[in-house]
């Protein structure tokens, strides 16, 4: 029985004073020595019973990859090679999920060690394996092995949307021998990984490497293609044997507050897309400036709100997060909240906008806020915010609204016969097939705004379902 070590090995981070001046990654990740020390804490639960595996949406063999690190302690390259081989069976994007997954709610939340101490830092170990493999060319060697083993079956599948669900589905299908083409509306593939998550959380070079690996598997990626406009859905159905829709939830949810259309008010989607995809923070090197005032209000309490707030802070603003519940009810990851607090983002709880106030030129100058109190839990399990009727005014010259996103109705309206629910989410059966035979969907397009790993889980499930569906055809 391994000796129980209650305290996890901390990961190095850049100092606050250094990191707030640029968009470089905050968490520096484990070295081999630190990763091995953390791996030693794992109790090695039997795979068939391991709670961490059950807590992972893609069911990575977590004890298995950690065991590979421990058993090859004198040979880091061999350790990482075996660990990556195990991870890749279930997760093709470990460098990404190791950074952005809410492990504390999933694998780490289920960890047995967490009942008496800190759970194993599974996410950071996964990231270490992926980073070490990339830096030492190990992933290229393993990928070459996989490519050599692919046997083409002559069938074609189209993927609409190059986000986490689409990329995962494409990778799995390519390994099964399908000819896969991804159609992406934007000029860069990656979806939320590229336009939604800032560099300081997910460096874009990592995403680009994963995309390069996908292309090496034989996947074609067509950008600047808006299905329904550039090419019709019916044309895709005629050309391909099956279709997967992974168009995400890219339409911002905006509440109709008075004054919400004033200059200086952004959706978090637009704000982060300009910064992440169009490199607004590098103006004039990139000609996509974004105007951020001296006092910025970010409305919301999820990861997107934290990303927007921390980005605005790096552009030189004084930033406030305004949230209608308390810190306890925030949906953002604890690590992201902690980083925002460390960096100087200010939090105001139990408030919600009543109206936005403009100056004579139509620019935002203040927000009237209403104080809230907490009532009984709602359907989310969190206590419901209740208006008190008490209001006050705070001066802000920029506001970023981060209260959620919904699926893109523009695309959905171009697909005749596709059934959606009242929220605009695509309706699917237990195999992720839509109301149209041979057309599957997953990720935020069926869930609404969710996590990267849940979208990847859908992509993996859909790939298996597509394979079963096409294998049954004569």
UniProtKB/Swiss-Prot annotation:
Subcellular location: Cytoplasm
Enzyme Commission code: 1.8.1.19, 1.18.1.2
Keyword Iron-sulfur: yes
Alphabetically ordered keywords of this record: 3Fe-4S, 4Fe-4S, Cytoplasm, FAD, Flavoprotein, Iron, Iron-sulfur, Metal-binding, NADP, Oxidoreductase
Residue stretch(es) of the prosequence: 1-2
Free-text remark on how the cofactor is bound: Binds 1 FAD per subunit.
Described function: A bifunctional enzyme that catalyzes the reduction of elemental sulfur or polysulfide to hydrogen sulfide with NADPH as electron donor. Also functions as a reduced ferredoxin:NADP oxidoreductase with a very high affinity for reduced ferredoxin. Exhibits a broad specificity for various physiological and non-physiological substrates with varied reduction potentials such as methyl viologen, benzyl viologen, FAD, FMN, methylene blue, 2,6-dichlorophenolindophenol (DCIP), cytochrome C and ferricyanide with highest preference for benzyl viologen.
Protein name (database record): Sulfide dehydrogenase subunit alpha
Organism for this UniProt entry: Pyrococcus furiosus (strain ATCC 43587 / DSM 3638 / JCM 8422 / Vc1)
């Amino acid at each position: 029985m391994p000796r129980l070590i209650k305290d996890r090995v901390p990961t190095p981070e850049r100092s606050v004073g250094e990191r707030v001046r640029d968009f470089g990654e905050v968490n520096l990740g484990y070295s081999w020595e630190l990763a091995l020390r953390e791996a030693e804490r794992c109790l090695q639960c039997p795979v068939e019973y391991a709670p961490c595996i059950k807590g992972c949406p893609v069911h990575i063999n977590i004890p298995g990859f950690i065991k590979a690190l421990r058993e090859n302690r004198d040979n880091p390259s061999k350790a990482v090679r075996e660990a990556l081989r195990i991870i890749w069976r279930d997760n093709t994007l470990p460098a990404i999920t190791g950074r952005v997954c809410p492990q504390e709610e999933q694998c780490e939340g289920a960890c047995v060690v967490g009942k008496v101490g800190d759970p194993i830092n599974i996410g950071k170990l996964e990231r270490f394996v992926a980073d070490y493999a990339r830096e030492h060319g190990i992933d290229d060697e393993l990928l070459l092995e996989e490519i050599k083993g692919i046997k083409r079956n002559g069938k074609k599948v189209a993927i609409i949307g190059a986000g986490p669900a689409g990329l995962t589905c494409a990778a799995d299908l390519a390994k099964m021998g399908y000819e896969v083409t991804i159609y992406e509306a934007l000029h860069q593939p990656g979806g939320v990984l590229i336009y939604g998550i800032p560099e300081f959380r997910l460096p874009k070079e990592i995403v680009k490497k994963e995309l390069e690996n996908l292309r090496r598997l034989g996947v074609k990626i067509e950008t600047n293609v808006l299905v329904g406009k550039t090419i019709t859905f019916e044309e895709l159905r005629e050309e391909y044997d099956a279709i997967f829709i992974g168009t995400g939830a890219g339409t911002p949810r905006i509440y109709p507050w008075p004054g919400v259309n004033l200059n200086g008010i952004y959706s978090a989607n637009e704000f982060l897309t300009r910064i992440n995809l169009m490199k607004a923070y590098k103006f004039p090197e990139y000609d996509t400036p974004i105007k951020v005032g001296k006092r910025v209000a970010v409305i919301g309490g999820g990861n997107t709100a934290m990303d927007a707030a921390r980005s605005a802070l790096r552009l030189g603003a004084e930033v406030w997060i305004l949230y209608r519940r308390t810190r306890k009810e925030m949906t953002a990851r604890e690590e992201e909240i902690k980083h925002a607090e460390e960096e100087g983002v200010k939090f105001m709880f139990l408030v919600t906008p009543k109206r936005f106030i403009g100056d004579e030129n139509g620019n935002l100058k203040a927000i009237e806020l209403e104080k809230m109190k907490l009532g009984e839990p709602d359907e989310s399990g969190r206590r419901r915010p209740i208006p008190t009727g008490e209001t006050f005014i705070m001066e802000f010259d920029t506001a970023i609204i981060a209260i959620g996103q919904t699926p893109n109705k523009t695309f959905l309206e171009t697909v005749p016969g596709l059934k959606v629910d009242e929220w605009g989410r695509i309706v699917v059966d237990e195999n992720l097939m839509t109301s149209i035979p041979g057309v599957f969907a997953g990720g935020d397009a069926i869930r609404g705004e969710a996590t990267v790993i849940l979208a990847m889980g859908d992509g993996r499930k859909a790939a298996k379902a597509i394979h079963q569906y096409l294998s049954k055809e004569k």
